Amino acid sequence: MKILSLECSASPASSAVTEDGKILAYSFVNIKLTHSQTLLPMIENTLKSAMLKFDDIEGIAVSCGPGSFTGIRIGIAAAKGLAAPKNLPCAAVSTLYSMAYNFADTDCILCAVMDARCNQVYNAVFDIEDGKITRLCEDRAILCGELAEELKKVSQNTNKCVIIVGDGTEVFYPFARDIEGIKKSGENNRYQNAASVGLAAAEIFDSG
């Protein structure tokens, strides 16, 4: 199933085409224009890179937050607008859940965090093993100190590394830096992206 996916939950925006767990094309922009200005040209570029036409697309996926209210609204509106003429199926994917797919090939405990200000983060925690992602808690807003205490207990009860991912990493990590077994993700796979949204959406489409 060829899926066109959109990610607009933060200042950067991205689009991707995925099929059967493979990324066919990916585009990313982080310039001082609104998502409403950049999204459609970016989608055209992504389809061109994948050597596809829109008629080849079989499903649309979009991140649904948490994140920027304006960005999420633009992304969802674009997804609905693209899907409606062909009656394509749509999948709304949690921004936090999609980031777990950045590490789908790494056995670890994945802690996704997005800055919610006032020493809080939007958060979800996942157990990843042999490519299977298991959610350990629902998406939530939580104080950084409380999350650090939770991860301390998790770290004590697993042999896996606990990896911090997301744009809230630098906000949260000082609260957890002294906990054994916790590390920050690298910059190259730290942030939300449309390719991971598409990979996560495939699971939603497969489940009906």
Predicted regions mapped to residue ranges:
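N-terminal beta-alpha supersecondary unit
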Residues: 1-64, 141, 191
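DPxDG-like acidic metal-binding loop motif
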Residues: 61-90, 95
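Acyltransferase
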Residues: 185-208
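A glycine- and small-aliphatic-rich helix-loop capping segment at beta-alpha/alpha-beta transitions
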Residues: 19-23, 76-88, 128-131, 181
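Short glycine/serine- and small hydrophobic-enriched flexible loop segments
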Residues: 44-45, 101, 199-203
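Phosphate-handling active-site elements
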Residues: 48-55, 84-95, 207-208
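Surface "functional belts" at beta-alpha junctions
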Residues: 34, 89-190
